[in-house]
Amino acid sequence: MRTSQYLFSTLKETPAEASIVSHQLMLRAGMIRPLASGLYTWLPTGLRVLNKVEKIIREEMDKSGALEVKMAVTQPAELWQESGRWEEYGPELLRFKDRGERDFVIGPTNEEVITDLVRRELSSYKQLPLNLYHIQTKFRDEVRPRFGVMRSREFVMKDAYSFHTTHECLQKTYDVMYETYSNIFNRLGLDFRAVQADTGSIGGSASHEFQVLAQSGEDDVVFSTESDFAANIELAEAVALGERGAATEELRVVDTPNAKTIAELVEQFNQPIEKTVKTLVVHATEESGHKLVALLVRGDHELNEIKAEKVDIVASPLQFATDEEIRAVVGAGTGSLGPINLPMPIVIDRTVANMDNFSAGANQDGKHYFGINWERDLPVPHIADLRNVVEGDPSPDGKGVLQIKRGIEVGHIFQLGTKYSAAMNATVQGEDGRPQTMIMGCYGIGVTRVIAAAIEQHHDERGIIWPDNIAPFKVAIVPMNMHKSESVQQFAEELYRTLTAQGVEVIFDDRKERPGVMFADMELIGVPHMIVIGEKNLEKGEIEYKYRRSGEKEMIAKDQLLDVLKAKFAS
């Protein structure tokens, strides 16, 4: 491709509306242009990358045995009403009426459509398992679209849905999809972790997120230094720290009128934060017979709300008690709560159960207990894993310690179960001749988000550094002062024809521009291999080669250039 025949729309300045690197570079590299809030037009450079990502996804999905379909973007409301999500789904669901006053939605996801398709097409267990996928533009009416294509209203996703008659069969497909996703992200050149994840509102029995490690990520990814353990921080198991020692301090009440937070208690009384406990009060379930329940974590630890919701006595969704609700039961405010004589059920974190000689509120305003010890001063309450892990914690599998990095979720797989198939009566005839509700798995990849994540992970101060497999072009030919040098033009044209004939994707910069501008543009759009042709070097029989990722330059004999390039492509 010649730049003179190409929409080469690079920008020198960073647009003010772009706050993260991927958004900035996608705009500057001429990959996308904004149309409206959260809506983008993909220009040729961006579309070349998008098509390559989709190609890799298709190849691996086809290899897994999944079958590609194409579902409608517009979906009838009846299906959403049948599944129960017409009422459940929030304002992100774009609803409209057609000219016949019938309700429709622009699909943000496809569980209803695929379940309806399969229940119409399949009748027997002999037709299962079946795994169908498609790649489609979707729409969610995000309240605050931001970060370019990272969180846009319109986006491209790969969705797959599998159907089974047994959980064992589902597990086999789930394992295949786990491996398939790993292959996809490896081929895309991404540094990622597959992490255990909460099933959330989608439900199901198992779930993994595929997280690309990047500082701009919105999620905390936890993984071991010495094993394959990896989990979203919401699900990462926190082991008990330390061992409970002897009760060496007397229990005493201390006036603490100006210590209403853990930080103030530590500062004013020279108390190690590891010897403090904070008490968080939340609503209890109706079945428990209590209004409130107290959750205790160490002073320097954070409550994990997902874990807390899984405690039997805790109401879901988690709701913290107000100061008024707490005072009505305890007679003291939130900054003075503790486990001794607390008139509500208590659940303590594993690490709190191992503490000794610690301090906590005395359930009187302006007073704290110091020197609290379990069993001597009060019985050990119910123990649960309540906290977020912290970097340096032992890995729960006993191998290594935990590291925490930011991650961008680009894929998610679920063992979905019968949530949709049961609601929509999607059955087949089982081996026993009776109707059997199909068991489902679902598997998603945010295709456009993958591109943004790749840029977040692969860039420098000069621009994008694409992994070779998804770069818009493989080679950039930069002829210096070509329009003033017949020898440079002749060699550049011949090289361009030869590489193009070999199937190499080449961007040939034939603009009448200064060399510095040409170099900057090719580095900005992230072409991996740059060939610089200069008149003086040609006279010496040499061509300059530059590798984008390392910045390494070398001179190559011009009669060996094609062989050297071939070797570099292979490596």
From Swiss-Prot:
Identify the enzyme class. ligase
Which locations, inside or outside the cell, does it occupy? Answer: Cytoplasm
Superkingdom of the organism of origin: Bacteria
Q: Name one GO cellular component term.
A: cytosol
Q: Hey, what's the signal peptide range on this chain?
A: none
Query: Which transformation does this protein catalyse, written as a reaction?
Result: tRNA(Pro) + L-proline + ATP = L-prolyl-tRNA(Pro) + AMP + diphosphate
InterPro entries (alphabetical)? aa-tRNA-synt_IIb (IPR002314), aa-tRNA-synth_II (IPR006195), aa-tRNA-synth_II/BPL/LPL (IPR045864), Anticodon-bd (IPR004154), Anticodon-bd_dom_sf (IPR036621), Pro-tRNA-ligase_IIa (IPR002316), Pro-tRNA-synth_IIa_bac-type (IPR004500), Pro-tRNA-Synthase_IIa_type1 (IPR023717)
Predominant location category:
cytoplasm
SUPFAM superfamilies found in the cross-reference section: Class II aaRS ABD-related (SSF52954), Class II aaRS and biotin synthetases (SSF55681), YbaK/ProRS associated domain (SSF55826)
A biological process (GO) annotation for this entry?
Answer: prolyl-tRNA aminoacylation
Task: List the Gene Ontology MF annotations in alphabetical order.
Answer: aminoacyl-tRNA deacylase activity; ATP binding; proline-tRNA ligase activity
Q: Which UniProt key words apply to this protein?
A: Aminoacyl-tRNA synthetase, ATP-binding, Cytoplasm, Ligase, Nucleotide-binding, Protein biosynthesis
Enzyme Commission identifier(s): 6.1.1.15
Record note on quaternary structure:
Homodimer.
Q: What is known of its domains?
A: Consists of three domains: the N-terminal catalytic domain, the editing domain and the C-terminal anticodon-binding domain.
NCBIfam families documented for this protein: PRK09194.1, proS_fam_II
Name the family. Belongs to the class-II aminoacyl-tRNA synthetase family. ProS type 1 subfamily.
Described by its record, this protein's role is as follows:
Catalyzes the attachment of proline to tRNA(Pro) in a two-step reaction: proline is first activated by ATP to form Pro-AMP and then transferred to the acceptor end of tRNA(Pro). As ProRS can inadvertently accommodate and process non-cognate amino acids such as alanine and cysteine, to avoid such errors it has two additional distinct editing activities against alanine. One activity is designated as 'pretransfer' editing and involves the tRNA(Pro)-independent hydrolysis of activated Ala-AMP.
Please identify the protein, giving its name as recorded: Proline--tRNA ligase
Taxonomic placement: Bacteria, Pseudomonadati, Pseudomonadota, Gammaproteobacteria, Pasteurellales
